[in-house]
Amino acid sequence: MDRENANGGEAQIDRNLAMEAVRVTEAAAIAANRLMGGGDEKAADQAAFKAMFKALQNIDMAGTVSIGENEGNGGTKLLPGDSVGTGEGVNVEVAMVPLEGKSILARGGPNALSLLAMAEAGGFLKFPDIYFEKIAVGAGHPKSIVDLDYSTETNLKNLAESNGCCVNELVVCLLDRPRNAELITNIREVGARIRLILDGDVSGIIQVAKPDSGVDIYMGIGGAQEGVLAAAALRGMGGQMQGRLVVRNAEEESKAIELGFNDLNRKFVCEEMAYGNITFAATGVTYGPLLEGVHISNELAITHSLVVRSQTKTMRYIKGYHPLK
């Protein structure tokens, strides 16, 4: 039976959870924004985490953490397998990044976000917390137009042909990290333009699905768990992504094998990383090409959020006004 057309039950719950997800990211974004430019990324991350955790605990759901926070946050953690929500209602898996772009926010820079995704039980692939090679494009292209096994030149020429443009008109987004230095050189040699970001590869990937973002393709190495969040977003927004684990040493190889990833050359697509009915929400913490940042004035916080649902392919932009007294 089509979940979306079924009477009662799960489809209605999904719609309700979409708005609840936005409330969670709004709370985290407001808390983090208060520390913008303060130079303390740990404090900002802790504030976002605490606000997100508190908001999650108020949702009528039996939530299980798939991707959480494991760096302490003042002694509080949410690890895979931990429970969130009231314990009543639908069973869901939760993947969260309370503050993407910690270093950006600490410097007062643009494009910090609060992110949350929810899936049916078993909906998120459980990667180890290691590096992940990624490539992503927006909707409207032939399947497998880009591939991690293609050369940089082939990927960009294929995309340019699909777009009906020249390679030098394309914009490639990727993290400004030493691990991407060779890729950056290759992109420049092919002739495409580059948008380097300091942090937050989930937001970079999401931009490929937003026609007016100015980004045509995302490439490079980031985090594996962030790849799952990005896949959740693209499931609702449209687009293609491939990812592959990047193992740097024996310890990381052991982590991957322990979780069942025996073929380290395997490529994963969105539908494998985020399966079934998915809800994804993001709220801007600071201004960026995807979302406006939190604006606080006269005891009022104004937020700008995006929520998408994979089953309907619906994208909603929501502006929220939050009295702070």
Model region roles, listed by residue range:
Residues 89-100, 104-123:
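DPxDG-like acidic metal-binding loop motif
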Residues 176-180, 200-203, 221-227:
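Gly/Ser/Thr-rich loops at beta-strand to alpha-helix junctions
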Residues 65-69, 94-96, 105-107, 126-127, ...:
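General beta-strand structural signal in soluble alpha/beta enzymes
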Residues 2-10, 17, 207-225, 229-325:
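Oxyanion/phosphate-interacting regions
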